[in-house]
């Protein structure tokens, strides 16, 4: 007599023969009929057989009622796409934005009355109060060139500040060319107007950069780019250092614009000149202190203000040999 293996899943398997019941739908389960000796089979009367068939038909009818018909799209049908309508809607949106810019310009700088702007002593340019404020920034690291540094930007737990964190690694990429690496940066997006025109910030009435930050004691480089040409030179910027104290307390950082020095591709240039404050394109923060490990920088807001006690125009000297245009 053959042995019968009964599984807990309701599948009956004979070790010599397997035959699935084709009448049952797939979702009912797999049942295999066993062909064992007649002495082990239960005698089924005609009444029991009729009742079992009735139950099976009722179960199949119940499953038929539960089936959901899905509307599968026909392969012959193609989605209707109107490029003319899309272009027209895009043009209408840009013209609407252009109209708003013209109306705001006629009202005054930044759409505010001129008297209010003249009397303004401080202005918050960037603050972090909701997740949409993070969309105005870009984070990058040497990972884009094969390095191992990582940087992330998110809102803090109380949604009242931005948390910039990650891991700095000075290990150069294994490309056979790079000898040094290890930087992480956070850069503000260039503002755009109607028809994707580049806009700029006008800080000409202010003389100091004002930040409220909380760090881990690492030094950061604050970079300001100015938009004075039709083609923006991304490697040319004005830079200055920002030193964080570390610890749980916030610190207010005030950097006069006269302290920013001109650099190109990370090198301080011999020819220096003051920062043009009415054509500010973006601001950024760079960490590259060659100290491997985790870091963080929490930022409450970034703004500008006028310090009446600061009268310096430019902190660095120029030689007529290096920059003769300033001495004509």
Curated annotation (Swiss-Prot):
- Where is this chain primarily localised? mitochondrion
Which key words tag this protein in UniProt?
Answer: Chaperone, Mitochondrion, Phosphoprotein, Transit peptide
Bias class Basic and acidic residues marks the residues at 55-69
Q: Which residues carry this modification: Phosphoserine?
A: 319
Per the UniProt entry, what are the Gene Ontology biological process annotations, in alphabetical order? mitochondrial respiratory chain complex I assembly
Transit peptide start-stop: 1-24
- Gene3D superfamilies found in the cross-reference section: Galactose-binding lectin
Q: Where is the signal peptide?
A: none
* UniProt xrefs under Pfam families: CIA30
Where is it located? Mitochondrion; Mitochondrion matrix
Annotated Gene Ontology cellular component terms: mitochondrial matrix; mitochondrion
Q: Where is the composition biased (Polar residues)?
A: 44-54
Q: Where is this region: Disordered?
A: 44-80
Family assignment from sequence similarity: Belongs to the CIA30 family.
This molecule's function is given as: As part of the MCIA complex, involved in the assembly of the mitochondrial complex I.
Quaternary data: Part of the mitochondrial complex I assembly/MCIA complex that comprises at least the core subunits TMEM126B, NDUFAF1, ECSIT and ACAD9 and complement subunits such as COA1 and TMEM186. Interacts with ECSIT. Interacts with ACAD9. At early stages of complex I assembly, it is found in intermediate subcomplexes that contain different subunits including NDUFB6, NDUFA6, NDUFA9, NDUFS3, NDUFS7, ND1, ND2 and ND3. Interacts with TMEM70 and TMEM242.
Under what name is this protein listed? Complex I intermediate-associated protein 30, mitochondrial
